Design a protein with these regions (language model features):
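Hydrophobic alpha-helical transmembrane segments of membrane transport/permease proteins
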Residues: 24-76, 167-213
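Alpha-helical transmembrane segments of integral membrane proteins
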Residues: 10, 107-108, 112, 116-140, ...
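Hydrophobic alpha-helical segments of integral membrane proteins
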Residues: 17, 57, 61, 71-87, ...
Length: 353
């Protein structure tokens, strides 16, 4: 039986990976045409700082980067280069740097930014959802639902702006500088990031015992993480609460209570396991929401990760950077959904693919 189940799972994974490849291809095609139909002229944006540039130079530059060609010809050239590992070179946001090199440089800061929310949000949201369901219609439930409403109603860019203003203009002033959070960028100007072994500041700080870099990096990550946690906490907490309320009405939960099982064991061993099945999909979807939310948090806190560069590339018309970043985000999101489906079988062995 186990061999049959393992074989079915393997076949399912192979099928899902093939579907992912097809979906990524369609994302690539759609992204190319949508970005190239944008009314943004990258050459004009780059040369607008110097109005004395002759028109002939402008035309030569358009020809050099290939934007003068018909869109379908550009598409064939890009696809050929893409599958050969050449994703193009940035023209605006990192002049001349290969897109793959740029992504390798800005991927670690974004992962560090979303790492704390990814770890804390599932733990906090499940705990809050259980507490809210357990104390339904009591003051504990009212407080938790109030926090949920805050996360649902307040956009992340607005909340991030409020947090930044509070930390820089109120908290710092009224504590006379004793409490001083860094409210922009990934590191302070006076902190040297020399030992770039992994590209992850926190990991490199641990490896090289750089206490100054570690403390500074954590201070810069803290405020954007708080904004992400408050906003993303809401959906998973709400889903956990609803699932727990449904499960706690089931006969097997009532039977466990009738047998004298402790309430703690009823919640953790009987109810929670089944309530986590729909919630696990929300938790995996958290990765997608955090990546999308990083576009706003990185812009507000001037944190130069994937979101910051994506926004800058859209503004400047740096097409190859836009496409490269969206493809990477798509791969992460699709991989996350695959992991969620596999986790279903771990949470509930009755699910067979």
């Amino acid at each position: 039986m186990k061999m049959v189940k393992s074989k079915n799972m393997l076949m399912y994974l192979v099928k899902r990976v093939l579907i992912m490849v097809v979906m990524i291809f369609f994302v690539l095609v759609a992204t190319f045409f949508l970005t190239n139909l944008m009314e943004v002229n990258p050459v004009l944006n780059k040369m607008s700082s110097d109005p004395r540039v002759p028109w002939e130079i402008y035309l030569e530059e358009r020809e050099r980067i290939g934007v003068d060609k018909p869109i379908f010809e550009r598409f064939l050239i890009y696809m050929t280069n893409f599958f050969q590992g050449n994703w193009g070179r940035s023209y605006i946001v990192a002049d001349g740097v290969p897109v793959t090199t740029l992504i390798a440089q800005i991927f670690p800061p974004t992962i560090e930014l979303v790492l704390i929310p990814i770890i804390l949000i599932p733990i906090l949201s499940v705990k809050l959802g259980i507490a809210s369901a357990k104390h339904r219609n009591k003051w504990q439930d009212s407080i938790i639902r109030g926090v949920i409403m805050l996360g649902v109603c307040v956009p992340i860019f607005f909340l991030a702006t409020l947090i930044q203003f509070f930390a820089s203009n109120i908290l710092n002033v009224y504590t006379y500088g004793v409490i001083d959070f860094e409210t922009s960028s990934a590191n302070s100007i006076n902190i040297d990031y020399i030992n770039r072994l992994t590209g992850f500041r926190l990991i490199d700080a641990f490896l090289f015992n750089d206490q100054a870099l570690l403390q500074d990096s954590l201070l810069h990550i803290l405020l954007p993480s708080i904004a992400s946690i408050v906003v993303s906490l809401a959906s998973i907490t709400r889903q956990t609460r609803a699932s727990m309320l449904d499960v706690m009405r089931m006969d097997y939960v009532r039977t466990a209570r009738a047998k004298g099982v402790a309430e703690k064991d009823v919640i953790n061993k009987h109810a929670l396991r089944n309530a986590l099945i729909p919630t696990s999909n929300e938790i995996i979807g958290l990765v997608a929401s955090l990546l999308i939310g990083s576009l706003f948090t990185e812009m507000i806190f001037n944190y130069k990760g994937m979101g910051w560069y994506l926004f800058a590339a859209i503004q400047g018309g740096d097409y190859v950077v836009i496409m490269g970043l969206i493809i990477v985000d798509s791969i992460i999101i699709l991989s996350g959904t695959l992991v969620a489906d596999v986790l279903y079988t771990v949470i509930d062995p009755r699910i067979v693919y």
